[in-house]
Amino acid sequence: MTGKKSPNGLFAARKLRRKRLKFRWSEREFKIRMLGLKKKYDPLEGAPMARGIVLEKVGVEARQPNSAVRKCVRVQLIKNGRIVTAFVPGDGGLLVVDEHDEVLIEGIGGPRGRSMGDIPGVRYRVVTVNGVSLRAILEGRKQKPQR
């Protein structure tokens, strides 16, 4: 007769809990969270937002079944020099953003910090341009200052 794999009884709780904790290390998300690997490889280094300089404007083709050119910019982050691609939201948003502008970027809000919707490889979006909100500029409330 084979033995039971898990203990049972009134005083088995500690043993059961320890066993569960041991098996959690085989889960990918748990391991990434506990070892702090997201901060290590994240261009924003765990911060919610980051400032950067626009290097160039790029058009990213949308994934199937959509057909569009999503307006994005290549941004070099000030704090560590890494280059990321950021989506420019809004109608005419790319007309406002020029090369060498200083922009503030944040996560685009995709699942588990990844890209969102049909934009492949783009994890960030532009929030402000030269210290002024992109939305305010597009709505006509404020003017973009010249750098």
UniProtKB/Swiss-Prot annotation:
Family stated for the protein in its record: Belongs to the universal ribosomal protein uS12 family.
Cited SUPFAM superfamilies: Nucleic acid-binding proteins (SSF50249)
Native organism: Hyperthermus butylicus (strain DSM 5456 / JCM 9403 / PLM1-5)
GO biological process: translation
Assembly and interaction partners: Part of the 30S ribosomal subunit.
Keywords of this entry: Ribonucleoprotein, Ribosomal protein, RNA-binding, rRNA-binding
Gene Ontology molecular function: rRNA binding; structural constituent of ribosome
GO-annotated cellular components: small ribosomal subunit
The protein's role, per its UniProt record: With S4 and S5 plays an important role in translational accuracy. Located at the interface of the 30S and 50S subunits.
SS bond partners: none
PROSITE patterns reported in the protein's UniProt record: RIBOSOMAL_S12 (PS00055)
Name of this chain's protein: Small ribosomal subunit protein uS12
InterPro entries per record: NA-bd_OB-fold (IPR012340), Ribosomal_uS12 (IPR006032), Ribosomal_uS12_arc (IPR022863), Ribosomal_uS12_euk/arc (IPR005680)
Domain of life: Archaea
Cited Pfam families: Ribosom_S12_S23 (PF00164)
Classification via PANTHER family: 30S RIBOSOMAL PROTEIN S12 FAMILY MEMBER
